[in-house]
Amino acid sequence: EDCYIETPFHANFGGAHVHFGKNVYANFNLTLVDDTHIYVGDYTMFGPNVTLATAGHPVLPELREKLYQFNLPIHIGRNCWLGAGVIVLPGVSIGDNSVIGAGSIVTKDIPSNVVALGNPCRVLRPISERDREYYTKGRRFSEKQ
């Protein structure tokens, strides 16, 4: 409901296993490897070139040769923001209100209400009252806006 998805948009199964909440925004080149379910909460935003991959393959060469694959669901909470170029791997959950920095590779669960970034993605800090005053480094919200 009231979602806005920029094109191009890519999904393995045409989004058949994708469950978006209301008011989800996705910038261009959102790629959903939806071999199993992907759940996205209300008011979540995706920057350009984000990939959510539910499928993976074994490290063991003999198993890959047999075309083995595993599929694990991804859960993205309510009101999250995933920056440009983020990659979320199979089985990961991201808690409500969290921000994932651009270029991060999310290999493990991220709790609610944090800023996380990096490769592998790690929690940098909690979202705090300071974030009500500053919208980005050194830039304050103005009462006149």
Specify the residue positions occupied by each region the protein language model found.
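Membrane-anchoring hydrophobic helices of lipid-metabolizing enzymes
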Residues: 1-2, 7, 11
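Flexible, glycine/small-residue-enriched loop-and-beta-strand segment within the central core
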Residues: 9-20, 25-93, 119-120, 125-136
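Short-chain dehydrogenase/reductase
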Residues: 81, 99, 105, 115-117
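Conserved catalytic segment of ABC-fold P-loop ATPases
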Residues: 95-98, 111-113
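Short glycine-rich donor-binding/catalytic loop of glycosyltransferases
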Residues: 103-104, 109-111, 121, 127-128
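Leloir-type glycosyltransferase catalytic cores
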Residues: 138-145
